[in-house]
């Protein structure tokens, strides 16, 4: 049997997820029902993702917001457009402030992304389409790309 020493856990660096929530969700299905009958080929999907980080009033508390937009089109129709703002409140405990930017830009979005992905898949399926399964995102690569763009 193992015993957990809570004194040690309180001083260990860790990220705590205090809340996760939908801030905004919109799905447009503008050409239904005609577009639902025209699903003989895979639609073109245009996907955009942005991350917003807000420093909250309590020390070391941050809101990390994923903004995801997907537009599906085929030759005839704009099939659907979905926009989701999904956020989490994170507490960075006993973590050096120099490490905060990378944790907030990489680790925290990676923690909440699967939930946002599931919401988008469910909504697109409920709109009469195949569920939109967004591929996993390498938030580390996005962060490094953004940092290199800022240095240039």
Curated annotation (Swiss-Prot):
CDD domains: Translocase_SecB. InterPro entries: SecB, SecB-like_sf. SUPFAM superfamilies: SecB-like (SSF54611). GO terms for biological process: protein folding; protein tetramerization; protein transport. It is found in: Cytoplasm. Its main location: cytoplasm. Keywords: Chaperone, Cytoplasm, Protein transport, Translocation, Transport. GO terms for molecular function: unfolded protein binding. GO terms for cellular component: cytoplasm. Transmembrane segments: none annotated. Belongs to the SecB family. One of the proteins required for the normal export of preproteins out of the cell cytoplasm. It is a molecular chaperone that binds to a subset of precursor proteins, maintaining them in a translocation-competent state. It also specifically binds to its receptor SecA. HAMAP family: SecB. Homotetramer, a dimer of dimers. One homotetramer interacts with 1 SecA dimer. This is Protein-export protein SecB. It comes from Rickettsia africae (strain ESF-5). The gene is secB.
């Amino acid at each position: 049997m193992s015993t957990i020493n809570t004194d040690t856990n309180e001083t260990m660096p860790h990220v705590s997820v205090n809340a996760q929530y939908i801030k905004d969700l919109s799905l447009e299905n503008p050409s239904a029902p005609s577009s639902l009958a025209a699903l003989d080929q895979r639609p073109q999907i245009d996907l955009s993702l942005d991350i917003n980080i807000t420093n909250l009033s309590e020390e070391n508390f941050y809101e990390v917001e994923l903004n995801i937009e997907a537009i599906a089109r085929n030759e005839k129709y704009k099939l659907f457009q979905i926009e989701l703002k999904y956020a989490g409140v994170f507490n960075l405990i006993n973590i050096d402030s120099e490490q905060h930017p990378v944790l907030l830009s990489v680790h925290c979005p990676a923690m909440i992304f699967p939930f946002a992905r599931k919401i988008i898949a469910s909504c697109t399926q409920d709109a009469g389409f195949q569920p939109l399964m967004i591929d996993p995102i390498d938030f580390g690569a996005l962060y490094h790309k953004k940092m290199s763009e800022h240095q240039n």
